Amino acid sequence: RMGIGDMVIFLPFIEAISKSFKIPVSILVKENSKAIQFLRENKTINQIIILDRNNKNKSGRHDGIIGAYNLAKDLKKYNFNKIFIFNSSFRFNLIAKIARIKGIHQYPLFNKKNQHIIDAAKNFIKKELNIETESNPQIAINDKLVKNSKFNYKINHEEVNILLGVGGSGPTKRIPSKIFINFMKLVTQKYKCRFFLATGKDVEEQKILHEILNTQYKDKCIALDDLSLSEILPVIKNCDISICNDSSFSHLSSGLGIKTIVLMADTPLLYGSYSTKMFPIIPDGEITVKHNTLGKEKINPNTIFEQFNKIFN
């Protein structure tokens, strides 16, 4: 699976396997899943093995035919007895066999089309382990790190500490700065607030960040873009509520148990609604959202504020 969001979504299913066999498990993930940075406190995961595949130029150690052999050779060293493959790829099935893993559990082969990311995983775990799994991921975090973060950032719960996840992996997911700024105007009229701004280093993400910082609210803002993900997590855990684009921060925030308003502009609604901690907002005039909805300009700051009030009160 590709990124942070996918990694968070699959956590309950990984944990179900661990609990079924009463041992921690190893996971094979891509580096951009950032699993090493946010799963270090997860007691059901023993080892994080990095899948070295480069989708752009196919130059990774595990790319191509030779890469498949390399991966099989790498996995063989661990002497795994079982493998659970959360996709329908024949390639991974063959790799598991070459690695001499006897117990191969996998989605139905060649059945990727229109595959529901959550339902497919639920059905898989039910079929293989007879376990009903709730899609409600939880990310474990060290309490000491949370306390240190609270001290370092002088976080005071007499004011409302709000995470604003203003970044996003693609331009159609990034809600314009004016919408966040208008929300900030509304919320500061009623509440005493601090805003923690989470984003990446992409040029367009930085533009949105600096447009927000170049407002009357700049003294109420703390930018988190120079921190590593593992440094950001304790800050998020100290927040009272989050408002995030459909991005890694919406998944991480909800996984940390923070009620998260997810601004859904251009991806299927399930990515912003699979957790009980998620409260999706869709563009004005739409009854749902999916790929190519292209609705980022139609996210209404008044609707965000209304949802904020419902949650916070």
Can you name each region flagged by the protein language model?
Residues 1-313:
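Catalytic machinery of carbohydrate-active enzymes
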